[in-house]
Amino acid sequence: MSAKTLYDKLWESHVVHTEQDGGVLLYIDRQLLHEVTSPQAFSGLRAAGRKAWRIDANIATADHNVPTTDRAAGIADATSRLQVDTLDRNCAEFGIEEFGMHDKRQGIVHVIAPEQGLTLPGMTVVCGDSHTATHGALGALAFGIGTTEVEHVLATQCLWARKSRSMRIWVEGELGNGVTAKDLVLAIIGRIGTAGGTGYAIEFAGPAVHALSVEGRMTLCNMAIEAGARSGMVGVDAVTIDYLRGRPYAPVGKIWDQAVAVWGELHSDPDAQFDAEIRLEATDVAPQVTWGTSPEMVVDISARVPDPALEKDPVRRKGWSDALAYMDLAAATPISSIALDKVFIGSCTNARIEDLRAAAAVARGHHKAASVKAVLVVPGSGLVKAQAEAEGLDRIFRDAGFEWREPGCSMCLAMNADRLEPGERCASTSNRNFEGRQGAGGRTHLVSPAMAAAAAIAGHFVDVRDWIMH
């Protein structure tokens, strides 16, 4: 039998039917639903007189529109309130379990599914959200889909799809102190570009990747999308198994033992061939900061803003010039001199307990700079919030002048009350720095949680490695 990649194994085990043109009917093990991309899907079921085919394979939560301040006051914005209320009604009508706004398990969909054991190795996982790739960190095939496809999965638990090409990104060595999975994935995107992974399913592998926790691996897979890929994944190892053991929806007893035996095979075979392969040295990676309006516009903290005049490619040169104009930055500006108005620590990229611990370790005993208007710390779920409070992290943040919020997508995107005002500059642990992503006219710089906390205290970007040493 020929050697197979992890992607091959996951794909082939879910093929229901293959058409002559290469189209594949793929079985979907888990669908995750939220309030933004599901309403029309439920309406389609209702109009056709259909029920959900497998109620137990679908689970929902509200995350994009929920307020991160006083939940008891409800949702002020009428459109946001309608979306959340509609999700509640649809889930009740179709019998789908929902972690509602006042459920202690509620949170960002890509945080709650792994922490609940709803995402398991070997699964196919879909959601009407591009960052569904996050779940690949557990050895799953996970990807975002459109609203019409959400309806198809509700109705049939299957989906028409075409197989991607395979890419392996191998990271040798060990990340240095103060350098995180977020820095690694930003460095990868800086190298291959936001189109580098287009048409591929990316497997992250190598000693540096398998030295990461599952939460760090989720950060890598989460931003595979920003590299242009359809999905990202990491092979199963003992770290994966230990993470899942005892999760509420994970198997138990003999079924757990059987599952672990199967999961142990979910890695690429030693001789497996990939369509493309990229290799990096972890020791070469430093803390990263984006300077422009695309995740690929990123440099080390010690660098300066690039000069478009030095770029030979005319398309890239114009893109850089436009980005600098929007970001109100001059070429050759030291990254460390860029002052900030706000800081956001949260999102499906970096709002798990390890992320909050990293930020709190930097913030402990300090206070935000007077020039920084606000620092929002938004846990990824109610359970992450409770764990952080049990560890006293909330007190560290409050003592530092940071705001401790309720779980939700928050300032990752301007779809709720947490947003930037025109011209405001933000250090953000989220995944996208597009124009207007955090609010019309807002300027976003992507960083790790530790880098964000250090910037909040200094009032500008600093090398968190120096901060940790002192």
UniProtKB/Swiss-Prot annotation:
Keywords: 4Fe-4S, Amino-acid biosynthesis, Branched-chain amino acid biosynthesis, Iron, Iron-sulfur, Leucine biosynthesis, Lyase, Metal-binding. Pathway: Amino-acid biosynthesis; L-leucine biosynthesis; L-leucine from 3-methyl-2-oxobutanoate: step 2/4. It catalyses: (2R,3S)-3-isopropylmalate = (2S)-2-isopropylmalate. It comes from the Bacteria. Its cofactor is [4Fe-4S] cluster. The keyword Endoplasmic reticulum does not apply. Disulfide bonds: none annotated. GO terms for biological process: L-leucine biosynthetic process. It is an enzyme of class 4 (lyase). Its EC number is 4.2.1.33. Binds 1 [4Fe-4S] cluster per subunit. One of its GO terms (molecular function) is 3-isopropylmalate dehydratase activity. The keyword Transcription does not apply. [4Fe-4S] cluster binds at residues 348, 409, 412. Belongs to the aconitase/IPM isomerase family. LeuC type 1 subfamily. Heterodimer of LeuC and LeuD. HAMAP family: LeuC_type1. NCBIfam families: leuC (TIGR00170), PRK05478.1 (NF004016), PRK12466.1 (NF009116). Catalyzes the isomerization between 2-isopropylmalate and 3-isopropylmalate, via the formation of 2-isopropylmaleate. This is 3-isopropylmalate dehydratase large subunit. It comes from Acidithiobacillus ferrooxidans (strain ATCC 23270 / DSM 14882 / CIP 104768 / NCIMB 8455) (Ferrobacillus ferrooxidans (strain ATCC 23270)). The gene is leuC.
